[in-house]
């Protein structure tokens, strides 16, 4: 019973992220208000079930969406950054490069080459 509740909460959290990843202010606190849980408990549970932190998951979702936009649009990097929830293009580029080992601009070049 408790297992099902936990899985349901994680599912809801993931769905919430999918629907709100564009919001730069999306935080653990925001999602916990939605789920009526304490941030500490939610964070522990999320990591236990998914094997990653909530922030790592949110970052992954945002970067996957960015990759889709880089592949499917001609939007400038700063536009894509904003569309996936990053207010600062430089920070977006930093996070992207840390994850993929290449800048968003170079990534696009390798895909369209």
Pin down the residues of each PLM region.
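N-proximal short alpha-helices
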Residues: 4, 15, 36-39
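N-terminal positioning helix adjacent to the helix-turn-helix/winged-helix DNA-binding module
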Residues: 5-13, 59-62
């Amino acid at each position: 019973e408790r297992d099902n509740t936990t899985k349901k909460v994680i599912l809801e959290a993931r769905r919430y992220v999918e629907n709100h990843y564009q919001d730069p202010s999306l935080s653990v606190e925001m999602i916990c208000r939605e789920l009526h849980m304490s941030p500490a408990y939610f964070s522990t549970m999320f990591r236990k079930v998914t094997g990653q932190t909530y922030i790592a998951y949110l970052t992954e979702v945002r970067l996957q969406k960015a990759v889709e936009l880089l592949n499917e649009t001609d939007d400038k990097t700063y536009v894509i950054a904003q569309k996936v929830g990053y207010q600062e293009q430089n920070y977006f580029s930093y996070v992207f490069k840390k994850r993929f080992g290449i800048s968003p601009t170079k990534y696009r070049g390798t895909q369209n080459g």
